[in-house]
Structures are given as structure tokens and as C-alpha cells.
Amino acid sequence: RAYMKIVIKAKIPVVLATSPTMSCNYDCVGCYSRDRVSENELSTDELDKLYKEAENLGISTIVVTGGEPFLRDDSVKLAEKHKRLLFVIISNGSFISKELAERISRSGNVITLVSIEGFTADTDLRRKKGAYEVVLSAFDSLKKSDAFSVLLLRIQQ
């Protein structure tokens, strides 16, 4: 409650949501990025300036979504550069290798939300065959590297 009082009194938002890319390696039915073309994406330098300005304004959290944020090679690099910001990166998990998970863990300011549709059949149906195992592997890599991560369950009827 104390935190919410501060947030409500704040003159600026505490969270900035960004979609550095709308590109994705999946073609999920019902996904808002499915039919979008990734044009006019901000460059790494432009994102760097945006995040610096966010810091200067007192914003504390950057939510990074997409598309698939890890299609870009600057997602963690920018978090490493802006240590005073907390980055919440929402991913489908398909690019999270052991090495990337370790880098995320070392950064100390990244929370990775890995989305999943449910069990094997649901996830594979919406994404593609084998996607469920990819998500579990990504989450396992994050867990083993001691990276702060959340499994984000997508519920739909």
C-alpha cells in the first residue's frame, strides 16, 4: 500500500513498456504481432537514449515485449548498460540458451517472463510442434543459472 501511494502521487509513470521488435519466429494463432511487419524499429542507440531518458525521469521499470525480444541481440546488452532500471522481458523462450540464461542472471536487473499456453498439446498447437519442450528447456536454463524468471501461463477458452 505504501508503494501504491508513492506511485499514485508520482508525476511520471514508474513503468515504460516497449516493443523493440514486432518480429517473431512463431506464427501463433490469435497473437497481436502475427500480422504486423517489423518496420521502423528503433536502433540500439535510439533505445539506449530512450532508456537513459526514462532513468532521468525516475522511471524504474522497463517492460520489453514484442514480437520476440530476443530476436534482437541488444535486449540484454541494454539492460547491462542501464543497471538502475529493472527490465522485465516477455519471451516465448525459443532463443533462451544456457549461455543467454547465464548472461541474464549475471545482469542482475532482468526478470524473464517465459510464456506458455498450457501442456504440450496446447502449446504445440498454437505455436508449432516441439514448442512446449523448447519452453521447458528455456525455463530450465534460467532456473539453473539462477536467473529470476517467471513462467507466464496464457489462459484462453
Please place each PLM-identified region on the residue numbering:
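Conserved radical SAM core fold
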Residues: 69-71, 93-98, 114-129
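Short, histidine-centered active-site or binding-site loop motifs used for metal coordination
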Residues: 34-35, 116-120, 155
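Internal metal/ion-chelating core segments
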Residues: 88, 115-116, 138
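Conserved alpha-helical substructure of the radical SAM core
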Residues: 1-102, 107
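Hydrophobic/aromatic residues located in beta-strands of well-ordered beta-sheets
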Residues: 62, 87-89, 112, 149-153
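Internal, well-ordered alpha-helical segments in soluble enzyme and binding-protein domains
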Residues: 100, 131, 135-138, 151
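Conserved strand-turn element in the central/C-terminal portion of the radical SAM core barrel
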Residues: 138-157
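Alpha-helix N-cap and loop-to-helix initiation/capping positions
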Residues: 42, 46, 126-134
